[in-house]
Amino acid sequence: MADGEEVSALVCDNGSGMVKAGFAGDDAPRAVFPSIVGRPRHQGVMVGMGQKDAYVGDEAQSKRGILTLKYPIEHGIVTNWDDMEKIWHHTFYNELRVAPEEHPVLLTEAPLNPKANREKMTQIMFETFSVPAMYVAIQAVLSLYASGRTTGIVLDSGDGVTHTVPIYEGYALPHAILRLDLAGRDLTDYMMKILTERGYAFTTTAEREIVRDIKEKLAYVALDFEQEMQTAQNSSSLEKSYELPDGQVITIGSERFRCPEVLFNPALIGMESAGIHETTYNSIMKCDVDIRKDLYGNIVLSGGTTMFPGIADRMSKEITALAPSSMKIKVVAPPERKYSVWIGGSILASLSTFQQMWIAKSEYDESGPSIVHRKCF
């Protein structure tokens, strides 16, 4: 590195479904790839083919026919550290093509991430990757920063988990955070199920990816579910066609809005939990009465599963029905919300005031992994 050159920090948002990684100061992540590690099902048959012992991300996805695929992050929380290390290695060396020992690294974590997990992340960064400095930030807090706020409640829904996180003056309020194990992956499963009922069978992991694409391209949230069902029954105005990779064209109608309806009515997939609107309301009600007004007026959506058209209007309608009648309710759905956690990290890591917040290697050497609880909150 030249002396005068500013070293850019790396920002890595590890989601259950996708890793988003890039450089602080950029307006979007450079690398976005599936959080998957695949290992060969069979010993290498073809000698000299240079078969790797593990594949990560897109390469694992494309070779899935011969691999066993695993997601090291379940419901937002890292459960398999060996595979997680492979994902980070792939992120630094193959995707971003940087030497981690030359850049500070900002990582993200799920709300209510166990303490031992934060320590393990910290340890791997300093000991395996020899980073000069690092920081761990809560995902929902970064999304709120990305929306230009420091107070509000974030509904963050990704592939593996959904959280409602009330934040006041930049600090998440842990006692009021609620977690819902219902997210994008479950919606894809449900879409597979209701398409099967229509006579289109999707079963394999490869076909699941097709259904995910159908969901992302065609699904939307109905403002009034019952009325939408009536419309779907009486006319074909809501029907859309989709071309499968083999050229076959399928038609879908009510499935388009029945799929994301699960977010508001988890009973549709046999879950007893409250929907996202009620969970948001319950989260607000766990907060001090004095700050509720600020939360109702700043409900920020974040994550890929909040990308359905119509979700903000429906959310607004449902919360209005639950809240006190005089309350002003505002649901904010930033267009870039699929990546707002990463964007918030990019903003935070490039602030001059943040530079004293990094955990330096010297501090880690002195205090060990527990330093993370003192410096990151």
Curated annotation (Swiss-Prot):
Major subcellular site: cytoplasm
Keywords on record: ATP-binding, Cytoplasm, Cytoskeleton, Hydrolase, Nucleotide-binding
Enzyme Commission number(s) of this protein: 3.6.4.-
SMART domains: ACTIN
First and last residue of the signal peptide: none
An example Gene Ontology CC term for this record: cytoplasm
Primary enzyme class: hydrolase
Superkingdom field: Eukaryota
Coiled coil: none
Substrates-to-products reaction catalysed: ATP + H2O = ADP + phosphate + H(+)
Gene Ontology MF terms: ATP binding; hydrolase activity
InterPro entries: Actin, Actin/actin-like_CS, Actin_CS, ATPase_NBD
Cell compartment(s), UniProt: Cytoplasm, Cytoskeleton
Family (UniProt): Belongs to the actin family.
Function text: Actins are highly conserved proteins that are involved in various types of cell motility and are ubiquitously expressed in all eukaryotic cells.
Stated name of the protein: Actin
Organism: Coleochaete scutata
